Amino acid sequence: MCIRDRTAEIAVKASITGHLVVSTLHTNSSANTITRLADMGVENYLIADSVVGVIAQRLVRRVCPACGIVREATAGEKKILGIKDPTRRINVRTPGHKECVRCGGTGYYGRIGIYEIMPVTADLRQAINRGENADVLEEIALTHGMKTLRMSAIDYALRGITLSLIHI
């Protein structure tokens, strides 16, 4: 089910009564999902009591494994990847040959999901009850080990799977 304003509170109340509710909500991050529910009129205490976790996801293009070219990252790519030392050697895989049979010459073969998984911990529940903004919620989640979408994309870039950081 995709949550809309008028059904958000019904979904939250159903989860409080023991029903497993799995839904979609279009936001830019896991933390923004919490604040979006509040913006829809769901009370903070209901959100804190009902949400056990949030997963944000994006699909990014996968560099073709058959023709992708491994090369050293440019200074700009290193900056995007968060590499502070510009002299550090970092390899990335970029789209390859136009004659590739596997990808039809596009340099990309399929898509792969990147994920941000935010379990709602006790600290996060308290922050939700206080009505904290998405930035504060994300900081709390990060202290409990959450990886952001950007961190996930960087991990895939360093492993040579994608270079689609611009979309994150």
Residue ranges and their predicted role:
Residues 4-165:
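Short, flexible helix-loop junctions that flank or precede catalytic/ligand sites
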